[in-house]
């Protein structure tokens, strides 16, 4: 294990590990996040973290991306262009279900967000506060999008951020590498799944 100390009560936050984004085939398969999650062992690593947190009675929290029927889209950018063309991630559909490998158990909370910030209007902040959480272990997809946004949102709220680099990914491996190596270390601890479990 590396030399660091876990501060306060931790929670595991799993971002956007849902059917439409991660399963193959799926409506958003072309983004590559699901392929990367399977090929790089990210799903298995998150499974290990889930088992470790549950086994110690620690919170496991999920965030799911959903697209409101009446949403608006910004004018510029590939994400918005693609979103305008797809009817995907509607509440109550297969798209927004957590992948079966990481399915929540009764009592575990799911928060629904749109588009990127898992805190904006979701109640996640209030829930973490109610549990006395001080440290968040951040996992999921995609490193350069919602996981990255979640990291900054956690930092802005002064949570102690831990990112297991092998428990998140991005369809663009260069983006993942850059964020993990050059951005996250400024606002949190970047380590491995095994190391996190060893410190629980």
At which residue positions do the language-model features occur?
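Active-site-adjacent betaalpha module
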Residues: 1-11, 47-56, 79-200
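A short alpha/beta connector and helix-capping loop motif
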Residues: 8, 26-53, 58-65
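N-terminal nucleotide-binding beta1-loop-alpha1 segment
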Residues: 13-17
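Short acidic, Gly/Ser-rich segments with clustered Asp/Glu that frequently serve as metal-coordination loops
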Residues: 18-24
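Flexible, glycine-rich phosphate/dinucleotide-binding loops
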Residues: 21, 69, 170
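Short aromatic-enriched loop/helix-cap "lid" or pocket-rim segments at secondary-structure transitions
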Residues: 26, 72-76, 176
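Short glycine/proline- and charge-enriched loop/turn segments
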Residues: 27-34, 77-85
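Early exported N-terminus immediately downstream of N-terminal targeting peptides
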Residues: 59-60, 64-83
């Amino acid at each position: 294990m590396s030399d660091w100390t876990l501060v306060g009560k931790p929670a595991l936050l799993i971002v956007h590990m849902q059917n439409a984004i991660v399963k193959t085939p799926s409506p958003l398969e072309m983004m590559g996040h699901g392929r990367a999650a399977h090929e790089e062992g990210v799903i298995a690593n998150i499974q290990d973290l889930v088992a470790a947190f549950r086994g110690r009675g620690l919170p496991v929290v999920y965030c799911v991306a959903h697209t409101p029927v009446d949403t608006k889209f910004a004018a510029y950018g590939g994400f918005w262009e693609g979103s305008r063309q797809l009817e995907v991630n509607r509440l109550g559909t297969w798209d927004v279900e957590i992948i079966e490998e990481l399915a929540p158990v009764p009592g575990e909370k799911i928060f629904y967000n749109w588009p990127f910030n898992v805190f904006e209007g979701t109640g996640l902040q209030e829930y973490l506060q109610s549990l006395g959480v001080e440290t968040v272990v951040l996992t999921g997809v995609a490193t350069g999008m919602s996981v990255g946004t979640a990291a900054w949102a956690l930092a802005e709220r002064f949570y102690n951020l831990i990112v297991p680099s092998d428990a998140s990914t991005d369809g663009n491996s260069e983006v993942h590498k850059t964020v993990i190596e050059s951005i996250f270390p400024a606002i949190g601890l970047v380590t491995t799944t095994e190391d996190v479990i060893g410190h629980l």
